[in-house]
Amino acid sequence: MVAPQRRTVMPALGLLASSLCSLLLTANAATVEQHWNINWVPDVNPDGLYPRHVIGVNGSWPPPIINVNASDTVRITATNKLETGVGASLHSHGMFFNRTGYYDGAVAITQCPIPPGQSFTYETLNSPASPADRRKQMGTFWIHAHNNDQYTDGLRSPVIIHPDDPADIHYNYDDDYTVILGDWYHSNYTDLVKNEFMNRKNPTGAEPVPKSGLIYFAHTSNKTSAATYLPGFSENATLPFEAGKTYRLRVINMSALAAFYFYLSGHDMQVIEVEGVDVLPQPVDFLSVAVAQRFSVLVTARNDTDPQNWKLHANMDEDMFDVVPEDLQLNVSATISYPNAPKDKFGPEKILEEYTYFDDLQFVPVNAEPMVTPDAVHRLDVSFDTMSDGENYAAFNNISYVAPQVPALFSAESMGALASNPAIYGPNSNAFVIKHNEMIEVQLFNWDAGKHPFHLHGHHFQVVHKSQDVTSDDPTINPPFNSSQVNPMRRDTVMVPPGGSAYLRFRADNPGAWFFHCHIDPHLVSGLASIFIEAPDVLSDSFLNVPSYIKNQCQAQGIATTGNAVGLNSTSDFDGLAKGPTYLESGWTGRAIAAFTGCIITGLLGLATVVVYGWHSGEEDDDEEEEDK
């Protein structure tokens, strides 16, 4: 086992050295800038089955890797070159954006979409507009589109942040690789949603099933200029190991729907990081990686006298699919290669007879944060239903999310005292107003038959409780709440099992408007989302200092930047806002009575037709008998 580096209280000399080190880090911090022309790239074929056009950057795919140090300032200028009349955006998943929520990238929450031909500069790490005492971030993240299903069509990439302060380096390893997992579709996802998912022909809400699963690798050492993708995908991809070396593997699931079980043949894994939170080393046989989740594991390479290669596995969780097509390869693998091992010589494959429940409460953060009694509790009940228009929608507390026209952040900063009234954000925004610095508990109850990974923007949360089945009397699958926890697991994306629950806690110390949603893309499309309006009494133009071009882009598209969800100074007038779906009414509604009456009339007409036909037929028979006589 590789132990974390333990640290004791430093004497005065150590404190002086630490202060000098911090000054040196500040002096050595770099400004990393990338320019992304977001455009369509033709004939991309990573699964070898079908070439298609995808959304890439600067004419290539996959998009660039962001590989930086924790003290760096990162700016990404995104230019919308899609040439389809559709807006774009980028969300840096897992970043906090303290006092810079307008860089979060969630369309209709923190910004308007980037108009065609225009640019938006995101300061994703250590923005000068953030306070000097902001919380440092390091670990494994990713950046992806947050508009119009565009990340499913390819606009997604790793974000790796390396610690550069010795006090933050808890583990030693020889090299660093990122393992990217993802599902892959052969059609534009917007078309799939329109034609196959949000459609009367799909009243049960069966999600579009991918054509393939992908594995590909990136070399992401802390020599930041060296970040590169390794060649090949899945069975054509190779991860190079050298005997005796220890590697950090950062596993990211960038799928729209698929979850993966990740494991290695012939090698042991120890989890050391979960979504930007270093944890005490925890041996695992496999990882259960839901959409948007990330883990880092340490793996020590073998030192065999007779070297051979080994398989790296990422098996798709078939429970995520309503129907598994016969031609879908669920079990995806790549190669761990060793020098001097014959190319076709492999060690025995590891076989998992079953996938046992993967408990993310088992991980213990290195930097402890105590569990604190919540000041406010919000319960969210997850459900899916066929609505009155014949389509299947998702909902929190029977409200299916409909985005506001005015970004919620701009409503919160412009509506004064009314900003604390959740009604102003729209009747279907699922807005929850939370007070500054309170401890918030979110209780999720999943009444759906499927698993759901939920992501909160702008925060880590503590996962303080999980149940696999809230109706069970078995404490092993429905345990009582453990009130004696001292350092609960923290992350930003949690999987809630079908029929199960999860309790999350976070400190409302980051004023802004933060999206909370299921990260399965079709479920977000169908309305499984809400907004946390955090400390609106703190927000103002002077607090945020929104760059003028951001609001100018809204106004150029005819979108207001002040007022309620439609730009009015009202808590009830939402004229022009798209209306949410309505539930099918039960009982004797007007339509039901009309339909029943129509059925009765149709039945009576049918009966009358039979009687009249029989009467005429009888007369004809009598006439024929008279003629025979």
From Swiss-Prot:
<keyword id="KW-0560">Oxidoreductase</keyword>
<dbReference type="GO" id="GO:0004322">
    <property type="term" value="F:ferroxidase activity"/>
</dbReference>
<feature type="glycosylation site" description="N-linked (GlcNAc...) asparagine">
    <location>
        <position position="222"/>
    </location>
</feature>
<keyword id="KW-0677">Repeat</keyword>
<keyword id="KW-0325">Glycoprotein</keyword>
<dbReference type="InterPro" id="IPR045087">
    <property type="entry name" value="Cu-oxidase_fam"/>
</dbReference>
<dbReference type="GO" id="GO:0005507">
    <property type="term" value="F:copper ion binding"/>
</dbReference>
<feature type="glycosylation site" description="N-linked (GlcNAc...) asparagine">
    <location>
        <position position="398"/>
    </location>
</feature>
<feature type="glycosylation site" description="N-linked (GlcNAc...) asparagine">
    <location>
        <position position="236"/>
    </location>
</feature>
<dbReference type="Pfam" id="PF00394">
    <property type="entry name" value="Cu-oxidase"/>
</dbReference>
<feature type="binding site">
    <location>
        <position position="93"/>
    </location>
    <ligand>
        <name>Cu cation 2</name>
    </ligand>
</feature>
<feature type="binding site">
    <location>
        <position position="144"/>
    </location>
    <ligand>
        <name>Cu cation 2</name>
    </ligand>
</feature>
<dbReference type="InterPro" id="IPR011706">
    <property type="entry name" value="Cu-oxidase_C"/>
</dbReference>
<feature type="glycosylation site" description="N-linked (GlcNAc...) asparagine">
    <location>
        <position position="188"/>
    </location>
</feature>
<dbReference type="InterPro" id="IPR002355">
    <property type="entry name" value="Cu_oxidase_Cu_BS"/>
</dbReference>
<keyword id="KW-0812">Transmembrane</keyword>
<feature type="signal peptide">
    <location>
        <begin position="1"/>
        <end position="29"/>
    </location>
</feature>
<feature type="glycosylation site" description="N-linked (GlcNAc...) asparagine">
    <location>
        <position position="69"/>
    </location>
</feature>
<feature type="binding site">
    <location>
        <position position="519"/>
    </location>
    <ligand>
        <name>Cu cation 2</name>
    </ligand>
</feature>
<feature type="binding site">
    <location>
        <position position="523"/>
    </location>
    <ligand>
        <name>Cu cation 4</name>
    </ligand>
</feature>
<feature type="binding site">
    <location>
        <position position="457"/>
    </location>
    <ligand>
        <name>Cu cation 3</name>
    </ligand>
</feature>
<feature type="binding site">
    <location>
        <position position="146"/>
    </location>
    <ligand>
        <name>Cu cation 3</name>
    </ligand>
</feature>
<keyword id="KW-1003">Cell membrane</keyword>
<feature type="domain" description="Plastocyanin-like 2">
    <location>
        <begin position="175"/>
        <end position="338"/>
    </location>
</feature>
<feature type="glycosylation site" description="N-linked (GlcNAc...) asparagine">
    <location>
        <position position="482"/>
    </location>
</feature>
<protein>
    <recommendedName>
        <fullName>Iron multicopper oxidase fer1</fullName>
        <ecNumber>1.-.-.-</ecNumber>
    </recommendedName>
</protein>
<feature type="transmembrane region" description="Helical">
    <location>
        <begin position="592"/>
        <end position="612"/>
    </location>
</feature>
<feature type="glycosylation site" description="N-linked (GlcNAc...) asparagine">
    <location>
        <position position="58"/>
    </location>
</feature>
<feature type="glycosylation site" description="N-linked (GlcNAc...) asparagine">
    <location>
        <position position="253"/>
    </location>
</feature>
<dbReference type="InterPro" id="IPR001117">
    <property type="entry name" value="Cu-oxidase_2nd"/>
</dbReference>
<feature type="glycosylation site" description="N-linked (GlcNAc...) asparagine">
    <location>
        <position position="331"/>
    </location>
</feature>
<dbReference type="GO" id="GO:0033573">
    <property type="term" value="C:high-affinity iron permease complex"/>
</dbReference>
<dbReference type="Pfam" id="PF07731">
    <property type="entry name" value="Cu-oxidase_2"/>
</dbReference>
<keyword id="KW-0479">Metal-binding</keyword>
<feature type="domain" description="Plastocyanin-like 3">
    <location>
        <begin position="401"/>
        <end position="537"/>
    </location>
</feature>
<dbReference type="InterPro" id="IPR008972">
    <property type="entry name" value="Cupredoxin"/>
</dbReference>
<keyword id="KW-0472">Membrane</keyword>
<dbReference type="InterPro" id="IPR011707">
    <property type="entry name" value="Cu-oxidase-like_N"/>
</dbReference>
<feature type="binding site">
    <location>
        <position position="517"/>
    </location>
    <ligand>
        <name>Cu cation 3</name>
    </ligand>
</feature>
<keyword id="KW-0186">Copper</keyword>
<comment type="similarity">
    <text>Belongs to the multicopper oxidase family.</text>
</comment>
<feature type="glycosylation site" description="N-linked (GlcNAc...) asparagine">
    <location>
        <position position="303"/>
    </location>
</feature>
